[in-house]
């Protein structure tokens, strides 16, 4: 948030759709979460430390479940730390309404695959068969580039439903190891 500044007309932001109070509204800087989500996704792939991240209240159309990151002035923020022994460079560009974000650094002898699981939340006792939300969890699988041995596995949970509901791991299907990887371009 501090890097991008307050999203106002005076700071050069245009109005676009944004989520506010459970509704879609026009807001200066609306759509900025596409940038934070792309950066979050790249940080996951780069095995960077995720210090702070919140998903949207609603499912977004530009990223798979668990890979979005909402930001709002005075509210949720995305904070990542370069916990590597070397510097990184974040590159971002926009062409033909396509956002491209990359994190460039030194090869550390590892590669990353991402996967996610998802399931529906059934939280209303009056209507036990009606889904009231979506639970999902991204998993970062880190492998050794030389041996293909699994080095680590980290989970990043998400939930898109009323705040009163709590995430319950029993509601999500069993996590599966990824078999392939697809690049996401926003």
Locate each region found by the language model.
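Well-ordered beta-sheet/strand-loop patches within structured domains
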Residues: 1-186
């Amino acid at each position: 948030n501090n890097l991008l500044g307050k999203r106002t007309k005076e700071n050069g932001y245009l109005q676009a759709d944004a989520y506010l109070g459970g509704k879609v509204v026009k807001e200066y800087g609306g759509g900025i979460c596409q940038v934070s989500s792309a950066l979050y996704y790249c940080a996951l792939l780069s095995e960077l430390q995720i210090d702070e991240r919140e998903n949207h209240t609603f499912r977004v159309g530009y990223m798979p479940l668990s890979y979005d990151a909402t930001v709002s002035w005075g509210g949720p923020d995305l904070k990542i730390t370069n916990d590597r022994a070397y510097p990184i460079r974040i590159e971002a560009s926009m062409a033909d309404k396509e956002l491209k974000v990359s994190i460039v650094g030194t090869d550390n002898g590892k590669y990353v695959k991402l996967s996610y699981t998802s399931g529906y939340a059934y939280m209303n006792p009056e209507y036990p068969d009606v889904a009231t939300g979506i639970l999902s969890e991204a998993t970062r699988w880190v492998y050794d580039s030389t041996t293909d041995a699994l080095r680590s596995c980290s989970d990043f949970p998400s939930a898109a439903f009323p705040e009163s509901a709590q995430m319950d791991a029993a509601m999500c299907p069993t996590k599966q190891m990824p078999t392939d990887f697809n690049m996401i371009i926003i």
